[in-house]
Amino acid sequence: MAHDMYPQPRPLLTPDLMIRAYAAGIFPMSEGADNPEVFWVDPQRRGVFPLNGFHISRTLRRQIRFGGYSVHINRDFAGVLDGCADREPTWINADLTACYLALHAQGLAHSVEIWDDEGLAGAVFGVTLGAAFFGESMFSRRTGGSKLALAHLIHRLRAGGFTLFDTQFVTDHLMSLGAFELPRSDYRAELSHALQLPADFMSLPEDVPLVV
């Protein structure tokens, strides 16, 4: 996928810089957990989830109806970061982790977590700004864990008045769930609109049931 990258030499990434970048349609990544450098990405085509078009498969529908899990919001945000970074390759380095933790402390970064009897089964996390949610990463430790987290996340975003769910890039997996690409100009128009609107990520209790 074509995208523009802007290397950032040290000094350090800051939470304020990250927020200003998100508002401009740019997001940071690194080359790996042990690589201290951060680069800025501005894709020519941007991945988004339609908040009314998330595809719930029969298997996922059965999982939701069967239950056997609980949903928590921000219960273990640091653990979610660790879970997302615990893969090869990873784009989350120490500076990014520190900034996400700081944004979480400011109420701007959130995790939707799926828990079962064995612990954290899967999760997704991202950053909120106005009525935009910037999805950063997700992981599963049990079958369907991240899909369950996504389903509950989208329900929460819709209830909270969000208008944009930015996935940054799209993969075949995300496309199978309904994600698609927007040209940069269209994405920026949607982002500009979303930034002017109020939204509330915490408008729902964390254990609200998902009816499918």
UniProtKB/Swiss-Prot annotation:
Subcellular localization: Cytoplasm
Domain of life: Bacteria
Presence of keyword Iron: no
GO cellular component labels: cytoplasm
Known EC number: 2.3.2.6
GO molecular function: leucyl-tRNA--protein transferase activity
InterPro entries in the cross-refs: Acyl_CoA_acyltransferase, Leu/Phe-tRNA_Trfase, Leu/Phe-tRNA_Trfase_C
Record's catalysed reaction(s): N-terminal L-lysyl-[protein] + L-leucyl-tRNA(Leu) = N-terminal L-leucyl-L-lysyl-[protein] + tRNA(Leu) + H(+); N-terminal L-arginyl-[protein] + L-leucyl-tRNA(Leu) = N-terminal L-leucyl-L-arginyl-[protein] + tRNA(Leu) + H(+); L-phenylalanyl-tRNA(Phe) + an N-terminal L-alpha-aminoacyl-[protein] = an N-terminal L-phenylalanyl-L-alpha-aminoacyl-[protein] + tRNA(Phe)
GO biological process terms held by the UniProt record: protein catabolic process
Keywords: Acyltransferase, Cytoplasm, Transferase
Pfam families the record matches: Leu_Phe_trans (PF03588)
Function of the protein: Functions in the N-end rule pathway of protein degradation where it conjugates Leu, Phe and, less efficiently, Met from aminoacyl-tRNAs to the N-termini of proteins containing an N-terminal arginine or lysine.
Entry's family note: Belongs to the L/F-transferase family.
Name of the molecule in the record: Leucyl/phenylalanyl-tRNA--protein transferase
Organism, as annotated: Jannaschia sp. (strain CCS1)
